[in-house]
Amino acid sequence: MIGILVSIAVTAIIFKYTESELTWSVIKRANWLLLIVAFLLQVSFWLLWALRMKLLSNYLGYRISFFHSLEITMASMFTASITPSSAGGEPVRVKMLSDRGVEVGTSAFIVLAERILDSMYFSTALPVFLIVTGFSTSFGFKIAIIFITLLLVFLYILYRIFRNESSIDKFAQLLYKAVRKFNEKKAEKYSSTFSRELRRFREATIKMLSDSPSGILVLYLVTLVMWSASFAIPSVILVALGYDAYFLYSYTAQLIIVIVSLVPLTPGSSGIAEVSMAYLYSNFVPTNVLGVLVGLWRLITYHTNIFFGAISVNYSLIKSKFVKNQLT
């Protein structure tokens, strides 16, 4: 896969230019138990993402088991890792949720709500950590301002689309015209579906905001803990290699990296994430350990997504074929 090759190539280049005799001694004395802890933090990230999806579904009146939520999460992690800006994960989650009996419009709301929760956390946490640490202040604040501006514009567009029934009809008509340009038969077939699912999306939004205000707080806290687990991984790796954790600096850098990685250039942000990490961490981590740190971090946070995600995808395919065979 292109993403894996780019990730390995860029990591190898970083390792080559930062390697020294000390690098190899660092690798030899690495605490493998702590590296396992770093991997378990990644596992907890998956589990918390699945928990958040289950809670969102429950708040909207759907009962999806935690196992199914985890299955959906891992399958989407796989597709996100092989598509630019991780964009492939969202359609997979919508499809798999709808396969579990959730309407398409409601499934789309659940997936979009996940991303809005993430964005809310990033946009509130990054300025706070930049002020507290004073790390990469100029660059970090530019990233924060751009990200918050885009988030507000996106939320305003959503409000304009879903504020009332007539605006939904207008947007549905625009979708119909756009699809008709590429495939007239499909546009005619799904013309009524556009409006129906957009209305369900609006209903899910209203239900969530009116019926579950405390649920939104719970979801935000789950989001905070989920990303904190992921952002703690580099600090644990550093301790495993015999260095200080630099937790606050590392957390701030991770917030910047996750936002920069949203730029849709390469599958799974391969190359972008590695270079961003090397650049930011070079401000407080010794140069000779950068290559090892970047390599282990991407192995734990990216390559495991592909490996375990692929297992989940294959499991889902085998299970669906088995069910079909049982029915026929």
Swiss-Prot record:
InterPro entries listed in its UniProt record: L-PG_synthase/AglD
Membrane topology type: Multi-pass membrane protein
Keyword ATP-binding applies: no
Keywords of the record: Cell membrane, Membrane, Transmembrane, Transmembrane helix
GO cellular component: plasma membrane
Pfam families: LPG_synthase_TM
Main subcellular location of this protein, as a coarse class: membrane
Superkingdom of origin: Archaea
Coiled-coil spans in chain: none
Transmembrane keyword on record: yes
Bilayer-spanning residue ranges: 31-51, 116-136, 139-159, 221-241, 245-265, 277-297
Subcellular location: Cell membrane
Record family assignment: Belongs to the UPF0104 family.
Protein name from the UniProt record: UPF0104 membrane protein AF_2231
Protein's organism: Archaeoglobus fulgidus (strain ATCC 49558 / DSM 4304 / JCM 9628 / NBRC 100126 / VC-16)
